[in-house]
Structures are given as structure tokens and as C-alpha cells.
Amino acid sequence: MSLWKDIKGTILPFWVTLRYLFRRPVTVCYPERKQTPAPRYRGRLVLTRDPDGEERCVACHLCSAACPVDCISMQAAEREDGRRYAAWFRINFSRCIFCGLCTEACPTLALQMTSEYELATRELLQVIYEKDELLIDGCGKNAEYNFYRRAGIGVVAPRGANPGESSPEDVKSNLP
């Protein structure tokens, strides 16, 4: 009985090898043929623009606060009309784990993940992307969304003087 087990244990792996020898290979020659990632694949991060063509990022620092590995950094600045923007924006992809928490935290939908997965390089400084490398020309996944149409720019007039706003109630007039 032991001899039969030994023979079977020797011949069975050869049979499996012969069976797979004449099948088509399942590996893909990567540089020549690129696979299409899944629809919800989380790849390289990009900064998008609003429908008016301006940057969506308002430098609120929510993305950098949500990042568990602290790979996002930026400097906030303000334009003359009161609109905030990121003076510089930097993502270190050597630290990024592509979790997507930064895109969920972004209130303006400025930071979005693409299906781009080719980020390999031999130089460490080439995986640190600056704002000009992250900013794309399009609106990204939510083309119709415009944060400033919904949120507006900072209020400078007193309460009740803005369009569509009622004047505040005088609470002292309600006292006896």
C-alpha cells in the first residue's frame, strides 16, 4: 500500500504539469499590453477644475487632516475677491496608500482619484507631485458641481443687507 502511495505521489504532479503545459498562459506581458483597471480602481490623485475653469481647491486642509500617512501638504492663500486657493499643493506618492480618505473629505470635490496606476520610477523625488503636475484641465467625475455657486464667497455686508436675506430680528424689542 505504501508503494502505491509513493508512485501516485510522484506521478500526480507530473500529470498536473502536463495538463497545464498546453494551456494558454494567463500572465499578461505588462509593458506591451496594459490591463484595464476595475471601474472603482483607486489610482493616482489629481486636482480638478470647476466648470468655470478655475481651481476647485480652497485649501481647507481637510484632505491632509484625513490622510492617515500624512502625505498631503499645502499652503493656503487668498485672492483679492476673498476666494481661497492653494498657493502650493504637494502629494508624496511614496507614502500614499491610495485609501481614498482624502477624496471623501474634500468638500469641493477638487481631489479625485483616477485609474492611472503607472507611478513607478527610480528617482525618489519624481514621486513627489507638485500642484502643476496634479492639476488637470477637466472637471473630473463631477463636471457640473461648482462649490462657489453653492457656498458663495465670504460675506462682507452686514446681516440682512445681502440679496435674498431678511433683516435680523431685534431680540431686545421682545423684552418687557
From Swiss-Prot:
Report the subcellular localization. Cell inner membrane
Q: Needs which cofactor? A: [4Fe-4S] cluster
Q: Establish whether keyword Membrane is in the entry.
A: yes
For this chain's UniProt record, which GO biological process terms are given?
aerobic respiration
**EC number(s) per UniProt?**
7.1.1.-
Which terms are listed as keywords in the entry? 4Fe-4S, Cell inner membrane, Cell membrane, Iron, Iron-sulfur, Membrane, Metal-binding, NAD, Quinone, Repeat, Translocase, Ubiquinone
- Specify which residues bind [4Fe-4S] cluster 1 according to the UniProt entry for this protein: 57, 60, 63, 106
Membrane topology per the entry is:
Peripheral membrane protein
Q: What is its main location?
A: membrane
* Pfam families hit by this protein: Fer4_7 (PF12838)
Q: Which reaction does it catalyse?
A: a quinone + NADH + 5 H(+)(in) = a quinol + NAD(+) + 4 H(+)(out)
Q: What class of enzyme is it?
A: translocase
Which GO CC terms are listed, alphabetically?
plasma membrane
Annotated cofactor note: Binds 2 [4Fe-4S] clusters per subunit.
List ligand-binding residues for [4Fe-4S] cluster 2.
67, 96, 99, 102
Task: Report if keyword Signal is assigned.
Answer: no
Q: Which GO terms describe its molecular function?
A: 4 iron, 4 sulfur cluster binding; iron ion binding; NADH:ubiquinone reductase (non-electrogenic) activity; quinone binding
What positions does the domain 4Fe-4S ferredoxin-type occupy? 47-77, 87-116
State the family it belongs to.
Answer: Belongs to the complex I 23 kDa subunit family.
Subunit structure, interactors included: NDH-1 is composed of 14 different subunits. Subunits NuoA, H, J, K, L, M, N constitute the membrane sector of the complex.
Q: Which PANTHER family match?
A: NADH DEHYDROGENASE [UBIQUINONE] IRON-SULFUR PROTEIN 8, MITOCHONDRIAL, NADH DEHYDROGENASE UBIQUINONE IRON-SULFUR PROTEIN 8, MITOCHONDRIAL
Role description: NDH-1 shuttles electrons from NADH, via FMN and iron-sulfur (Fe-S) centers, to quinones in the respiratory chain. The immediate electron acceptor for the enzyme in this species is believed to be ubiquinone. Couples the redox reaction to proton translocation (for every two electrons transferred, four hydrogen ions are translocated across the cytoplasmic membrane), and thus conserves the redox energy in a proton gradient.
Record-given protein name: NADH-quinone oxidoreductase subunit I
Top-down, what is the taxonomic lineage of the species of origin? Bacteria, Pseudomonadati, Thermodesulfobacteriota, Desulfuromonadia, Desulfuromonadales
